[in-house]
Structure formats: structure tokens, C-alpha cells
Amino acid sequence: DFLFVGPSAAQVLANMRVAAATLHEFGLVNNLAKLEGPAQSLEFLGIRIDSTLRTLSVPDRKLEAIVPKLEDLLSRRFVSVKKLRSVLGHLSHLSMVLPAARPFLRGLIDAVHYRQQESRRHRRLSGALREDLAFWLHHVRGWNGSQSWRAESDPVVLASDASTTGFGWVLEKAPKFTCDRLPSFMQPGHAVAGYWGEDLREMQSLSNNIGWGELFAPVAAARRMGPALRDSHVVFVVDNAGDVEVINRRRTTCPRMRTLLRDLCKLSLRYNFAFTAIHRPGARNILPDVLSRPSIHQHDLRVPSVCDKVTKEVIKDSIPKTSAPEPKPFAFGSFFLLDPMSKSAASIPLMFPLG
């Protein structure tokens, strides 16, 4: 199948004629019965594309078909591999419109391809798989099947970092419609710093757990901004290449990180924002790095003090001036205050106000 996109119906029609002639020259048959368009709304590979409403949508018949299949699976203890594959195919198709829902397919994929049971025709539904299926059932029931295109040309940019003792992030950039939704103390240029709670401190002190901390920071930032991210495109800037891959592929084999990734995806589905991650070398990610290290900022988070510490880190690392960040990273204002979290909630990383 071929999809032609152009600025006008005449241009698209001309492109279609050229393609038809080319296919004919190679002896290929054009199936005119499947021809559709030119139009501003058409169905391609089972997905309806509407350039006027700027939406991608799944036809109602596909949504209606998956609901009874999910209900049937959830009513059983053992399910045939054939039924699991059928549901997996339907949900994989839906995830083309909802890429943030892909992490909730992992359990179903594992159940279908579990090697130790390949010879068995039925699978037992685990508690985790049931939770995934229930998530899909709940979401499909309340979803109209469409997803709006996001404003990707002017993204929200969040830079973050984490260490074995803490984490931090700064809102570097945001489009006007996002800024209008944010209070004055959360505008671009404002930042957050935090440290790990008591029951996380020992675990996060191990360097092999740094990936979880690096992922926690952007997830916490997205949760904090919440509704302000609606219909936007969020770019997470991190200095951990592994986390960049996890965020962009919506996939991880680490159970702890999978929980965070699912939280991020749920936020994306709730507020309809797209998200991607890019890698910034640690030598250039100085401000988030300072915020993530209590040993450096020593809880003195006044703007002049943090600016001084950032400058010292730049000098210490001997970064060429052409690639060094500006010495005054808070040109848009001071830090914003973050409500302190109760120390009794030891399972939650602790955050403190920034002065």
C-alpha cells in the first residue's frame, strides 16, 4: 500500500498518476478497487488519518471488536495461545495510534513467546498480565479511538540528572500555550532539586541503580507539570544513553524501571502529550548535575550560590568555551518552590524547597 501526501489535492493526484504509471511499467497490477482519495480524511492500513482535525483514529468497528475479546480473557484462568496471539494483534494495531501504551503489551508478548511453555497450548494468566489486560479494557472503553497531533515544532524541554544521593531537573524551554498554564513559580528557567528517601538511599547509592534514578527525574517532572503538558511534545534531555533508549523505545527489561516507564506513559495518555528523549553529554549537563548532588550544592539553593557552583564545575571539567553552558542559567527567574514531601513516606524520594 502507498500513501501520498501533498499540499493540495491536485498535487497528490499528480503523484498518484506517476506512481500508477511506474507500477504499470514494471508489470505490476494497480488494484483500483482499493483506491481512496485524494481526501483530507482517509483510512490507511486500518488507521484513519484526518489532516483537517489533525487526528489519527481507530475505526469504531475495531474498538468494538477488541472489548469482548479482553473481557473473555479476563474471565479465564487459562487461555489458549491462539487467543492470546489474536488479542496481541489487535492491541499492537491500537498502539500505532497510542505509542505510549506499548509498555502495557510486554506481559502479553512474554506470555505468547514464553519458551519454556512453547509446547503447551494454553497459558496461565499471571496477576501482572491481568493488570495489563484490565488497563487496556478500561482505556478502550473510555477512549473515542482518536489521538490528536501534538505541537512538535515548539517542544517543552526538560533537562534532568540524578546521582547516587539525589536528583534534579530544570525546565529549559516551553511554548507559550504551556507557559500560560503554569504558575509564575514554574516558568522556564526554574528548577527542582531533591534527595532520596531513607529506604531508597542505600539502594540508590549503588552505581548500577543509577538508571532508575535518571528515569525517575523526568517522570517526576512530568507528573509535577501534569495538565500543563496537554497536547504538547516533551523532550527529555538526559545524560544517560541507556535511559534515552528506554524512553524512546518504551521498553525495558528492568522491573523497577518498567514501573516508572508505565507511570510516564499513563501521564502521556491522560494528558495527550508526546515525548521523546535526547542525549546530552554529562560535561554539558552541568546545572541538572549540580542540582542532583547535595554534596556540591550543600542545600544552599539560592540562585547566586548555584550559579557559582555551576561555573566552578564548568572550570573543573575544562570544557571549551564554545561548548560551555551560560554561566547564568536562570535568566528567566529564580527557582520555584516545591512542597516538601513527608519524611514518613520513606518509599518516596524526598524533595525540599528551593530558595
Which role does the model predict for each range below?
Residues D1-F26, I47-V58, L94, G242-M257:
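Catalytic palm subdomain of template-directed nucleic-acid polymerases
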Residues L23, G46, I66, L70, ...:
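Mobile genetic element proteins and their domesticated derivatives, centered on retroelements
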Residues P38-W149:
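C-terminal reverse transcriptase regions that engage the nucleic-acid substrate
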Residues P175-F216, G242-P255:
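A short, polar/acidic, helix/strand-boundary loop motif
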Residues D1-F4, A10, R223-L287:
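RNase H catalytic domain
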Residues L28-E43, I47, F273-I286, V290, ...:
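Acidic carboxylate-rich catalytic motifs and surrounding loops in phosphoryl-/glycosyl-chemistry enzymes
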Residues I49-V87, V290-G355:
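Flexible, low-complexity interdomain linkers flanking nucleic-acid-processing modules
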